[in-house]
UniProtKB/Swiss-Prot annotation:
This is Metapyrocatechase. It comes from Pseudomonas sp. (strain CF600). Homotetramer. Keywords: Aromatic hydrocarbons catabolism, Dioxygenase, Iron, Metal-binding, Oxidoreductase, Plasmid, Repeat. Pathway: Aromatic compound metabolism; benzoate degradation via hydroxylation.
Amino acid sequence: MKKGVMRPGHVQLRVLNLESALAHYRDLLGLIEMDRDEQGRVYLKAWTEVDKFSVVLREADQPGMDFMGFKVIDEDCLNRLTQDLLNYGCLIETIPAGELKGCGRRVRFQTPSGHFFELYADKEYTGKWGLEEINPEAWPRNLKGMRAVRFDHCLLYGDELQATYALFTEVLGFYLAEQVIDDDGTRVAQFLSLSTKAHDVAFIHCPEKGKFHHVSFFLETWEDVLRAADLISMTDTSIDIGPTRHGLTHGKTIYFFDPSGNRNEVFCGGDYNYQDHKPVTWLAKDLGKAIFYHDRVLNERFLTVLT
């Protein structure tokens, strides 16, 4: 957090049918519906999150990610980072407070990889869902589905990874936690963090700009991941891979698709990092084991199905 960017705050996803998407994210993943707006967007959050929302669903003709937002420490920090982005050569769009319900002024920019990100300082504080602030119980007893704990990260595909890396590290204060290096020594995947997490956002090289691989939600235990797999089967939800373990980050994971084809992940565990740790490096020739630690064989669908 050396530049004042604290954490992932929200992601806006495009879905083909709002009600079927809502049934997926609310009833299967277990997010809580918090609000709707005049544009028809639906706002959701996981139960441990203290701000009003972390996921926004927007009905559209094509699936994918509109943007990902990061929360900064205060308005002064937002102003400073805005100027830093301008000085770096980024084009800036300022979105007024209230355009997302309960969210303050947002500053949006596009990365060299073709993805849109935004920074904001203020969002309505609603507290952890279903718990009192004083003497809180361990968890709410009326959670649904997979009982997602928090929105954790996004994995994105695009080109110009080195330029994107420079923007995130030099301007926004991220650090490199893990990477994949090809035979020429070129970084083809980068896992960037603001915190002790294995990653807050990750990028994999792709010749096409602005592609979305997955949005990820944290669960508490391996038993919860297995239970998520049961729910995927019970609901005939399209599965991608898992349950399994990653070599990269060592998280225990399962991947599946929402009704629009956007890939989701739920996971538990994984490595921790501090900024004095050296980046963990995997070799591209061992990518099968890096992604699927048990099978050690690449799933072509996992690499090529993007929105």
